[in-house]
Amino acid sequence: MTFCLESTIVKPNGSEKIDNAIILLHGYGGDGKDISMLSLNWKRHLPNTIFICPNGHEKCSINPTGFQWFDLTKEDPIYILEQSIKAENKLNEFINEIKDMFKLKNDKICLSGFSQGCMMSLNLGLTSEEKFNCVVGFSGKIINQEDLKKRKKVSTNILLIHGDMD
């Protein structure tokens, strides 16, 4: 399986049948392999679900072994918005490849992520033309509320999880 983003893939146990996909997006400085560890417990409860964990499309600016969806070292909100939209475009290309390969529609795909991956999942989940099954986010936020208000197209079900120290 070759996609536009290098990915760690965790297939369902004992089944070739794939009915659902969970796309797990790592946080700033992480990679697909790191976040794929979540799938090891989840897959016991989600038969026929494939977990696809891409690396960000850019090397991380402060961690040369990790990746990023956009650079967080700059504090310019316009720059961050522009870079996050570039990342969204790359992720949309990636998601379309997954949909084609596994013959899935958005309603069979969950977007999930940690920190910066959560931020990307929220934006993708709310600006898509077609509603995703859900977004499950950990320790993230909306990148730019004003921009998202303008671009929001669907009301995807969202579960956001934060610790009491976030």
Which residues does each predicted region cover?
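Serine-hydrolase catalytic machinery in alpha/beta-hydrolase-like enzymes
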Residues: 4-104
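Flexible "cap/lid" loop of the alpha/beta hydrolase fold
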Residues: 63-69, 140-159
